[in-house]
Amino acid sequence: MKKLSTVIIILILEIVFHNMNYVNAQPDPKLDELNKVSDYKNNKGTMGNVMNLYTSPPVEGRGVINSRQFLSHDLIFPIEYKSYNEVKTELENTELANNYKDKKVDIFGVPYFYTCIIPKSEPDINQNFGGCCMYGGLTFNSSENERDKLITVQVTIDNRQSLGFTITTNKNMVTIQELDYKARHWLTKEKKLYEFDGSAFESGYIKFTEKNNTSFWFDLFPKKELVPFVPYKFLNIYGDNKVVDSKSIKMEVFLNTH
């Protein structure tokens, strides 16, 4: 009887863990659920705004510690980017910010706004702002982050696997933001994912699958209502600072031409 009870408990636990994996797997979108480039253009949207985000150099920093905070859910770092000398990253909540506060981190992110940080010496919010702002993009600095890791991105166009390309990262644990940026950067440069006046494609999404089969995806194109384009509304997907294992993450891109 005791053995039977043990078997039943094991079976229940297996079902629970199976269901946990199932719940954590975001279902793939249907074609009609994806944002359409033609809808965005018809609403007077300019895809060049998105193109600029993923072709401009990202913010990068290695082994840095935040110098201060403005709000409890952000961290400000002494990183030079273009003509600025500070970068503020916003995180989903205070707990997440505290995770990285006063610790040595690596940063990789896409800026969404400039002249957005109040100078430390100016408590008056009417004074001139500086710096640039981004979401997430933090990983703990590690001496193991030395060698490049290769990640293959499989691309399916109109339901046919068409090509694959490789991106690299020197991090064992890497943010989704870094991987997403590098994939979109390559697709924009090589396959015209984003052009000033549109795209070579009508819709699409990028999908990430972790070792435990947890999966999630991002729509590659803005909603038709995002006119005029507001960068923070497009990039706030990175605010959760999602970090994955670069050795096991699977990346796929699904594109449609009509």
From Swiss-Prot:
Residues 1-25 form the signal peptide. InterPro entries: Enterotoxin, Staph/Strept_toxin_CS, Staph_tox_OB, SuperAg_toxin_C, Superantigen_bac, Toxin_b-grasp_Staph/Strep, Toxin_bac. Keywords: Disulfide bond, Enterotoxin, Secreted, Signal, Superantigen, Toxin, Virulence. This is Enterotoxin type G. Staphylococcal enterotoxins cause the intoxication staphylococcal food poisoning syndrome. The illness is characterized by high fever, hypotension, diarrhea, shock, and in some cases death. Belongs to the staphylococcal/streptococcal toxin family. Its main location: secreted. One of its GO terms (molecular function) is toxin activity. It is found in: Secreted. Transmembrane segments: none annotated. PROSITE patterns: STAPH_STREP_TOXIN_2. Disulfide bonds join 116-133. GO terms for cellular component: extracellular region.
